[in-house]
């Protein structure tokens, strides 16, 4: 059985995290040549490349598996060392989360853990359709995803759903939808997407108004909070989680353009198995809070 030296795994991890050999060497306080030698040693052990030497470097499929192994070992070390780590560097927890969860329920859910435990969060924001891939690649130890099926050697639990409403300001609705939200009116009304892969509004408009993808003008803005601001200032109509705009809907600052029509995204919490004590705390906090504020039906 091949048993890698974890110093070599840490070198591989550093090259990926620091996006290059030079910064990885600085992070590890060794020479760049030593980093290269450690990775070469690891590649010789497994008889295949573990890095695609692009800019920035990225792991091969086998490299991803080894990084996932390293994440698990780091968490299990925390489990075994327990109180002996008191006063040492806080444990780094890298989690992949979607922007809308981060803007609504995730931080309040994690607040008790952050208050009571010596951890450093590294929250990597990704679309909920792609967060699980970061777990697969070993970049994170947990992920909030819409995928319901667990990866090999991982656990999954249902968190609950975010319901997305198609909203705008009242002046925007009066300008673009004087006769109601119709297919022809939507062709002229600007919407907003998080990035070029964000297809939520396209799916909603296609399903309910038979509008093909790309048929409406669309801004690209990488911020959930900015969606709310754009809608409030009358710039766009957009899909926003109901949980994020309860006050604006109650006050009338924003209006639901299509009452009874919405997009539901069920969210799941994925993480490596077995769970360390710290990850169990994170899991309990996310599930407890998620079950309170997210839709469970």
From Swiss-Prot:
InterPro entries: ArgP (IPR017685), ArgP_gammaproteobact (IPR023490), LTTR (IPR050176), LysR_subst-bd (IPR005119), Tscrpt_reg_HTH_LysR (IPR000847), WH-like_DNA-bd_sf (IPR036388), WH_DNA-bd_sf (IPR036390). CDD domains: PBP2_IciA_ArgP (cd08428). The keyword DNA-binding applies. Keywords: DNA-binding, Transcription, Transcription regulation. Residues 4-60 form the HTH lysR-type domain. The keyword Magnesium does not apply. Residues 21-40 bind DNA. GO terms for molecular function: DNA binding; DNA-binding transcription factor activity. It comes from the Bacteria. Pfam families: HTH_1, LysR_substrate. Controls the transcription of genes involved in arginine and lysine metabolism. Homodimer. Belongs to the LysR transcriptional regulatory family. This is HTH-type transcriptional regulator ArgP. It comes from Escherichia coli O7:K1 (strain IAI39 / ExPEC). The gene is argP.
């Amino acid at each position: 059985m091949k048993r890698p030296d974890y110093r070599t795994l840490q070198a591989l991890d550093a090259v990926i995290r620091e996006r290059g050999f030079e910064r990885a060497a600085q992070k590890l306080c060794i020479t760049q040549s030593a980093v290269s030698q450690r990775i070469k040693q690891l590649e010789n052990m497994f008889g295949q490349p573990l890095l695609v030497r692009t800019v920035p470097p990225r792991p091969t499929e086998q490299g991803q598996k080894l990084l996932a192994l390293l994440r698990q070992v780091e968490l299990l070390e925390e489990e075994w060392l327990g109180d002996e780590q008191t006063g040492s560097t806080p444990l780094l927890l890298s989690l992949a989360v979607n922007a809308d969860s981060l803007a609504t329920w995730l931080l309040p859910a994690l607040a008790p853990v952050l208050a009571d435990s010596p951890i450093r969060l590294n929250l990597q924001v990704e679309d909920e359709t792609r967060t699980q891939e970061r777990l697969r690649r070993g970049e994170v130890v947990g992920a909030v995803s819409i995928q319901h099926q667990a990866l090999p050697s991982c656990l999954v639990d249902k968190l609950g759903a975010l319901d997305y409403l198609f909203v705008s300001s009242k002046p925007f609705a009066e300008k673009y939808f004087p006769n109601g939200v119709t297919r022809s009116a939507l062709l002229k009304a600007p919407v907003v997407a998080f990035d070029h892969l964000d297809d939520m509004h396209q799916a909603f408009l296609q399903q309910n108004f038979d509008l093909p993808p790309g048929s409406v003008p669309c801004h690209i803005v990488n911020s959930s909070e900015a969606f709310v601001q754009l809608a409030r200032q009358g710039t766009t109509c957009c899909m926003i989680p109901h949980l994020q705009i309860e006050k604006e809907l109650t006050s009338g600052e924003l209006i639901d353009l299509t009452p009874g029509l919405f997009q539901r995204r069920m969210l799941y919490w994925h993480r490596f198995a077995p769970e360390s004590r710290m990850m169990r705390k994170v899991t309990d906090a996310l599930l407890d809070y998620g079950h309170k504020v997210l839709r469970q039906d």
